[in-house]
Curated annotation (Swiss-Prot):
Keyword Transmembrane helix: no
Protein name (database record): Dual-specificity RNA methyltransferase RlmN
HAMAP family with a match to the protein in the record: RNA_methyltr_RlmN
Domain Radical SAM core: 120-365
Active site: E114, C370
UniProt function note: Specifically methylates position 2 of adenine 2503 in 23S rRNA and position 2 of adenine 37 in tRNAs. m2A2503 modification seems to play a crucial role in the proofreading step occurring at the peptidyl transferase center and thus would serve to optimize ribosomal fidelity.
Cofactor: how and how many bound: Binds 1 [4Fe-4S] cluster. The cluster is coordinated with 3 cysteines and an exchangeable S-adenosyl-L-methionine.
Lineage, top ranks: Bacteria, Pseudomonadati, Pseudomonadota, Gammaproteobacteria, Lysobacterales
InterPro entries for the chain: Aldolase_TIM (IPR013785), Methyltransferase_A (IPR040072), RlmN_N (IPR048641), RNA_MTrfase_RlmN (IPR027492), rRNA_lsu_MTrfase_RlmN/Cfr (IPR004383), rSAM (IPR007197)
Enzyme Commission number(s): 2.1.1.192
Leading EC class: transferase
Keywords: 4Fe-4S, Cytoplasm, Disulfide bond, Iron, Iron-sulfur, Metal-binding, Methyltransferase, rRNA processing, S-adenosyl-L-methionine, Transferase, tRNA processing
Originating species: Stenotrophomonas maltophilia (strain R551-3)
Residue stretches spanning the membrane: none
Note: Reaction proceeds by a ping-pong mechanism involving intermediate methylation of a conserved cysteine residue.
Length: 401
């Protein structure tokens, strides 16, 4: 008979105020946690494994609640360590099951990132952020309008998975609700390489979230040297934000293309696949914008690019295309392609034997396009703060939050 594991009752999240001299255990993968237990606590490695399970399987952050640890070890942990997760600023479910969290990074409340859970019939995908803002300035991206602040720590990245899994009641050995993680949220993951790779290690560890390599996907705008480094240090699925079939157009949409043009980018993707035979394909993301990159000639050019990629890898279907209807946000000059143009674009690719999917928009009612909720909530927070200052200064009450 299978053991029945009770989902822990949802308790209020602890404050994310770090304590000087204490190690946040969420910042460590298995190897780092083992080293901490041996070198700092003077304990055996298996004790690190016990604590890792308490944190990631049972969502326990208080050492006193880790009941299979002795009092002496718990006292050591209280002295030298802590488990801090991000604070939830805003928790917004959608009518279609999509769920979005706005999470505060740090104790000052000035930085926030977004995490989105997208359920489907056979899987549940979590979209995770890697930076506060982004510095690549892609012209069609809402996050780019907010600028770049800083990289997220490993704890802040894996903390997003912890919060979502805790919310979903994702207890190991029961029905899995969180089946995939995509590093497609705010930021460029490869510009925060070490922290992202460490967090993805926890996602794929059986003591963490036990996801298969192919179920963790890193999406990049095309940092060629980091793609090459990733091929030797991690074994996750790779997605590339392409969005244009030629350099002239891509440079206007993704300025990084001026440094790493399409030919160099495609060559690095081919090297990524050839480095490990278990890697079957790279997904190329293509956001369709009305009158910009959705014309038939763009589709034919993209089909040629995919055929060239197959030849470089020497394997059929090495490149898959994911067509993404543009999700408008306030102030953008771009528009979503019409449905007829999207279908015509896809047909040209399919007729050219290119594996092509159209990503259906989810969570429109909660602004699930990355960067939108942060902009709305943080703007309201700013206006509320200004309103409060006005009242405190006795300047009247004609301001509005």
């Amino acid at each position: 008979m299978n053991e029945v594991v009770q989902t822990p009752a949802i308790q209020p999240l602890p404050k994310s105020a770090p304590t000087a001299g204490k190690q946040n255990l969420l910042d460590l993968d298995r190897a780092g946690l083992e080293k901490f237990f041996v070198e700092v606590l003077g304990e055996k490695k298996f004790r690190a494994h016990q604590v890792m399970k308490w944190i990631h399987h049972r969502y326990v952050t208080e050492f006193d609640e880790m009941t299979d640890l002795g009092k002496v070890l718990r006292a050591k942990l209280q002295e030298h360590a802590e488990v801090l997760v991000p604070n939830i600023v805003f928790d917004k479910p959608s009518a279609d099951g999509t769920h979005k969290w706005l999470l505060a990074m740090g104790v000052d409340g000035k930085n926030a990132i977004e995490t989105v859970y997208i359920p489907d019939k056979t899987r549940g995908t979590l979209c995770v952020s890697s930076q506060v803002g982004c510095g690549l300035n892609c012209t069609f991206c809402s996050t780019a309008t907010q600028g770049f602040n800083r990289n997220l720590t490993t704890a802040e990245i894996i903390g997003q998975v912890w919060i979502a899994a805790r919310h979903l009641g994702n207890v190991p050995h029961q029905m899995r609700r969180l089946t995939n993680v995509v590093m497609m949220g705010m930021g460029e993951p490869l510009m925060n390489f070490d922290n992202v790779v460490r967090a993805m290690s926890v996602m794929r560890d059986d003591l963490g979230y036990g996801l298969a390599n192919k179920r963790v996907t890193l999406s990049t705008s095309g940092l060629v040297p980091q793609i090459d480094r990733l091929s030797t240090e991690s074994d996750v699925s790779l997605a590339v934000s392409l969005h244009a079939p030629n350099d002239a157009l891509r440079e206007t949409l993704v300025p990084l293309n001026k440094k790493y043009p399409i030919a160099e980018l495609m060559a690095s993707c081919a090297r990524y696949l050839r480095a490990n035979k278990r890697r079957e394909s790279v997904t190329f993301e293509y956001t369709l914008m009305k009158g910009i990159n959705d014309k038939p000639e763009h589709a034919r050019e993209l089909a040629r690019l995919m055929r060239q990629f197959d030849n470089a890898v020497q394997a059929k279907d090495s490149g898959k295309v994911n067509l993404i209807p543009f999700n408008p946000f306030p102030g953008t000059r771009y528009e979503r392609s019409e449905e007829a143009h999207i279908r015509a674009f896809q047909k040209i690719l399919l007729d050219s034997n290119v594996l092509t999917m159209v990503r259906r928009t989810r969570g429109d009612d909660i602004d699930a396009a990355c960067g939108q909720l942060k902009g709305q909530v943080m703007d309201r927070t700013r206006r509320q703060a200004e309103f409060n200052k006005t009242l405190q200064a006795g300047k009247g009450s004609d301001a509005a939050a």
